Amino acid sequence: MNRLKSVVIAAVLLAVTTVASAVDMSKPTGTGTLTITNISIGSDGTTLDFEGPVENYGTVFATHYLQSVDGDRARGIVTGQARAMLNDGGMVVTPHHGTFTRSGSSLQIYFTDATNTGVVNFVVWDADVLTKKVSLKYWEVKSVD
């Protein structure tokens, strides 16, 4: 009986910890607006370059490589890098890994980053390749230790 009680208490503590560390997707940690500055088309994928201001990160410069996983190029994988030049002169560096979907000229890019400062973010970009405008939101899922 004591073992069952211990298992139940452990399960409740695990559930409470999981809920407590859940990310509230209705409240992003920050937002930003980027501009697509270059698009390079290749036989196996497309490279896009971006720059613009992002809340808490100063000016961001990023490159993403999009590779389709289907014939109509409506979804696929994203890999990339970003450099953020902070307002105090510091720099944050991070790789990007995720997925994308496309509908017409609209791209939705979803990825995680793992910054050199120890912060991990989940990031969503809504981009239009015709207007070259990108709006983004990010959620901090792991803060600095």
What are these model-derived regions, one by one?
Residues 1-8:
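Bacterial N-terminal signal peptides that target proteins for export
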Residues 8-10, 20:
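Cleavable N-terminal signal peptides
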Residues 15-18:
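N-terminal signal peptide c-region/cleavage motif recognized by signal peptidases
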Residues 21-145:
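Beta-strand-enriched cores of mature, soluble protein domains
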